[in-house]
């Protein structure tokens, strides 16, 4: 009898442990697959593609690749003598037409004052027409001068904002054309995270919700807030025009093919250049408040660890 009871007890304990293990695994799996999180996230930042507005030989490069620069700092300079001569020529034209306009204005004023008693109406009208023509030529010369001055100013390419120079591909002595990208500037204090959430997890994502960001290969957890959710995406397999919307390739996970939607996350603190734009991270949306790790159950902690491998 005692032997039977011991066998039943062991069987019951084993059964209870199996049930508890199944429940634990099931809860961890549900939390792992259905909670709002993703490993497909990227650090991003505002990037300015810097291109000159004038063409010419590069005479001086004042920065090096990946250098932190300040707004207004000179990046490189394009050969200036050609534009200085163009400005001098334009200023000479303005001076010439200014003198000529003054002469024609005096002539027209004199003829208008004398009137038809001293000369014909045709001669008076002709003087007025010549004056208007010279004034138009003066205005054109002034516009050409202003444009030449602007071109000369733009031979010096400056940083439009504080940030890091990256992908610098210009060198002294090279000829650069107007509008060709010379360098990219990653603007300082503009870093954010784009988390590509599966559509099945968007129910737990709302603007204002808190988020945890773990950069790949780091144990450091950054805090942030959901800033916005993309209003539309297009499927990469679609033949229709995306009309400017983000094109996201769907990942095949098990047998479900869920579309992913970009979620923009505003960082509480800027990481500077520690994690460059384009690097990956894991993002967990914790809800309206930050997650209190001290209150996490064993199952929840295990689910968080599973994310590092899934």
From Swiss-Prot:
Topology in the lipid bilayer: Single-pass membrane protein
Induction of expression: Positively coregulated with aaeB and aaeX by AaeR.
Location in the cell: Cell inner membrane
Keyword Ligase: no
Entry keyword set: Cell inner membrane, Cell membrane, Membrane, Transmembrane, Transmembrane helix, Transport
InterPro entries (UniProt xref): CusB-like_dom_1 (IPR043602), CusB_D23 (IPR032317), MFP_Efflux_Pump (IPR050393), PHBA_efflux_pump_AaeA (IPR022871), RND_pump_MFP (IPR006143)
Protein name: p-hydroxybenzoic acid efflux pump subunit AaeA
UniProt source species: Escherichia fergusonii (strain ATCC 35469 / DSM 13698 / CCUG 18766 / IAM 14443 / JCM 21226 / LMG 7866 / NBRC 102419 / NCTC 12128 / CDC 0568-73)
Organism ancestry: Bacteria, Pseudomonadati, Pseudomonadota, Gammaproteobacteria, Enterobacterales
Gene that produces this protein: aaeA
């Amino acid at each position: 009898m005692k032997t039977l009871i011991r066998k039943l007890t062991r069987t019951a304990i084993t059964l209870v442990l199996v049930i508890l293990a199944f429940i634990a695994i099931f809860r961890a799996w549900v939390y792992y697959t259905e909670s709002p999180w993703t490993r497909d996230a990227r650090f991003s930042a505002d990037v300015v593609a810097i291109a000159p507005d004038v063409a010419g030989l590069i005479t001086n490069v004042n920065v090096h690749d990946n250098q932190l620069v300040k707004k207004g700092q000179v990046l490189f300079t394009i050969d200036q003598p050609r534009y200085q001569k163009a400005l001098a020529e334009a200023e000479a034209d303005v001076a010439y037409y200014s003198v000529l306009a003054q002469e024609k204005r005096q002539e027209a004023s004199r003829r208008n004052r004398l009137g038809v008693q001293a000369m014909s109406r045709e001669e008076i009208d002709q003087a007025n027409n010549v004056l208007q023509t010279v004034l138009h030529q003066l205005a054109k010369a002034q516009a050409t001068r202003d444009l030449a001055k602007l071109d000369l100013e733009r031979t010096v390419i400056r940083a439009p904002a504080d940030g890091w120079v990256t992908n610098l591909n210009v060198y002294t002595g090279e000829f650069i054309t107007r509008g060709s990208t010379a360098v990219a500037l990653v603007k300082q204090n503009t870093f954010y995270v784009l988390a590509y959430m599966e559509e099945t997890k968007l129910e737990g994502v709302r603007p204002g919700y808190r988020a945890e960001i773990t950069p790949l290969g780091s144990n450091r957890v950054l805090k942030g807030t959901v800033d916005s959710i993309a209003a539309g995406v297009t499927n990469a397999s679609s033949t229709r025009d995306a009309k400017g919307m983000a094109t996201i390739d769907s990942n095949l996970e098990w047998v479900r093919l869920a579309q992913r939607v970009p979620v923009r996350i505003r960082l509480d603190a800027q990481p500077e250049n520690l994690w460059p734009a384009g690097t990956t991270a894991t993002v967990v949306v914790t809800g309206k408040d930050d997650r209190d790790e001290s209150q996490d159950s064993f199952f929840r902690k295990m689910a968080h660890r599973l994310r590092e491998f899934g």
